[in-house]
């Protein structure tokens, strides 16, 4: 299940969730790879430990070529929407060293389906990304080009019956 989380993160954000360029000392490449992907693995977007954010070390002279994907202030994992954000945190923070905490494949599937429902087409026809995930704010704009969304957004609130005569919002 870890590989599925990594693939989804890489596919959507064009970077590896654990390869941030953390320095482990003077060791050979194989040992460094084992630490980076194993016992010392650290999510590049960990909320309290930013020691794995040395993208210059990871990408070298190609750092600029891979922007905005190497700029976490412009493309944080949170731009993937609330459903995937939660699962990335579960997979790469809570479950990184505790496999039982990782989301199931079915949970990923449901989150991807729900996220697809939040997809909006950018109002800027020149935007390289073309689409972005609605972030449920009044000032909806594309996180990639900064263009304000020019259309109205129909919003449906779904409720489920929590217990008899008690209804709660689904999201």
Predicted regions located by residue number:
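Activation segment of ePK-like protein kinases, specifically the conserved APE
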Residues: 16-17, 96-99
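Regulatory extensions appended to serine/threonine kinase catalytic cores
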Residues: 79, 83-90, 98-171
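Conserved C-lobe activation region of Hanks-type protein kinase-like domains
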Residues: 1-2, 7-85
């Amino acid at each position: 299940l870890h590989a599925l989380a990594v693939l989804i993160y890489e596919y959507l954000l064009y970077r590896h969730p654990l390869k941030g360029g953390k320095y482990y000392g003077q060791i050979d490449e194989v040992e460094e790879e084992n630490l980076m992907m194993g016992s010392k693995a650290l999510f590049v977007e960990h909320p309290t430990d930013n020691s794995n954010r040395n993208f210059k070390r990871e990408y070298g002279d190609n750092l600029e070529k891979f922007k905005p994907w190497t700029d976490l202030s412009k493309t944080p994992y949170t731009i993937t929407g609330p459903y995937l954000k939660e699962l990335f945190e579960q997979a790469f923070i809570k479950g990184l060293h505790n496999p039982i905490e990782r989301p199931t494949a079915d949970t990923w599937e449901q989150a991807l389906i729900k996220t697809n429902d939040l997809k909006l087409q950018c109002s800027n026809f020149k935007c390289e990304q073309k689409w972005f995930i609605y972030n449920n704010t009044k000032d909806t704009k594309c996180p990639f080009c900064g263009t304000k969304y020019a259309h109205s957004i129909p919003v449906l609130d779904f409720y489920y019956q929590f217990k008899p005569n008690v209804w709660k919002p689904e999201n």
